[in-house]
Regions:
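N-terminal secretory signal peptides and thylakoid transit peptides that target proteins
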Residues: 1-15
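Blade/loop signatures of beta-propeller domains
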Residues: 28-50
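Surface-exposed loop and turn segments in beta-propeller and other repeat-based domains
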Residues: 54-60, 154-168, 172, 206-219, ...
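Beta-rich, blade/repeat-based domains predominating
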Residues: 59-74, 105-118, 130, 163-182, ...
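Conserved beta-propeller blade signature
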Residues: 77-79, 121-123, 185-186, 238-240, ...
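Blade-loop segments of beta-propeller domains
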Residues: 86-89, 93-119, 126-128
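Blade-level signature of beta-propeller repeat domains, shared across WD40, Kelch, NHL, RCC1
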Residues: 338-368
Length: 368
């Protein structure tokens, strides 16, 4: 199976130098709709597509891969990418650029946000895979860095080799983080050894779990691309972890004990994003009807509190048979190319960051 990890290791990013393009698509009730007239979604979760939301110039604020987005307490949308001319781009909800910074994260990938004593802080993940000036793919251990929203570094989490948490032959290429209500930090080592690393709020290591070598294979993670704290049950918070190569999420207790598996057939899901009573996720790849992973594919998915898929914008409508979700496919409209992350605002609009998508900026979906 082709994974993003092997893709990065074997070649420079395919998006370099390509021109942005938009494919025409079908709208609900209008099969001749142009891309920005398109309505996508299912079961009341329907959205108008806006490819031109981000009002930036490629000459002054270029993007390579748009990886993750969060919204701060001021309502601003913060994007991380891997172009070191501006790793961080900050927009208002209309798509106007408000600020940009960051020149030292060549593999800028993960972005989470927390609020402490009235101030917003970011956790930036550099996964360690990057492309040098000659276009060659390179690798180094990754890092997780806490900053404020202006880019001032607060601390860097210790790498697991330095604290005896990893063996010498275990790779460390983190992809994403989650922050618990008590400030504890969970790091998903999705392109490395597939552990979830647990630190306290000061960056002191507590434990690790997951990986690929458990006696019970259900406890394993394969491309542990994302992690989120699910607080919908106020008395029983849990961790939702991505196992992207298995097309599923796995649920663990806050101290790493396995609870259950949530299958998403045909959906190579990225990080879970909690918003209200729903889980949202980008689907970085989807499969064809023979189960083969499709390049240039992907969509989004929306899941309820019972872990039932309600809608897959950009994909086919969810179908259940005898309570079992059937495979979901990319819709023929092909709205998305490698949906890597979503950010959902207070109006239920969704901002979609895409990887390897011809240097395109985030797409906005306005709920209708």
């Amino acid at each position: 199976m082709k994974t993003r990890r092997t893709f990065i290791q074997s070649t420079a990013l395919a998006s370099a130098g390509l021109l942005a393009s938009k494919s025409f698509a079908f709208s609900i009730g209008n099969k001749h709709a142009k891309p920005d007239e398109l309505i996508i979604g299912h079961n009341g979760f329907t959205y108008k597509v806006d490819h031109g939301w981000a009002k930036i110039s490629a000459s002054t604020h270029p993007v390579n891969n748009c990886h993750e987005m969060v919204q701060d307490s001021q309502g601003r949308l913060i994007l991380i990418g891997d172009d070191t001319r501006n790793n961080i781009l900050i927009f208002d909800k209309s798509g106007q650029l408000l600020d940009s910074w960051g020149t030292s994260y060549p593999a800028g990938h993960g972005l989470s946000i927390s609020k402490e004593n009235g101030e917003d802080f970011l956790l930036i993940v550099d996964n360690g895979f990057y492309t040098d000036l000659s276009g060659a793919g390179k690798s180094q251990p990754g890092n997780v860095i806490k900053t404020n929203t202006k880019g001032r570094i607060i601390f860097t989490l210790p790498q697991p080799h330095a604290i005896g948490a990893y063996k010498d032959d275990e790779g460390y290429h983190p992809t994403e983080t989650a922050i618990a209500p008590n400030g504890d930090i969970y790091v998903a080592d999705g392109y490395g050894s597939d552990y979830i690393l647990h630190y306290d709020s000061k960056g002191r290591f507590i434990r690790k779990f997951g990986g690929r070598k458990n006696d019970n294979k259900e406890h394993n993670l394969y491309c542990a691309h994302g992690v989120a704290v699910d607080t919908r049950d106020k008395d029983n918070s849990v961790l939702i972890c991505t196992s992207r190569e298995e097309c599923c999420f796995k649920v663990f207790t806050m101290d790493g004990k396995f609870i259950k598996r949530i299958d998403t057939p045909g959906m190579h899901v990225c990080r879970p994003v909690m918003h209200g009573q729903h889980l949202y996720a980008g689907v970085c790849w989807s499969n064809d009807k023979e189960g083969k992973q499709l390049d240039g594919s992907g969509f989004l998915t929306i899941i309820d509190t019972n872990f039932k898929v309600l809608a897959s914008p950009g994909g086919t409508a969810p179908v259940y048979k005898n309570g079992v979700l059937q495979q979901t496919f990319q819709h023929e409209s092909k709205v998305f190319r490698h949906g890597h992350d979503v950010c959902v605002d207070e109006d239920d609009s969704i901002y979609v960051a895409q990887w390897n998508a011809n240097r395109t900026t985030p797409i906005k979906l306005t709920r209708v």
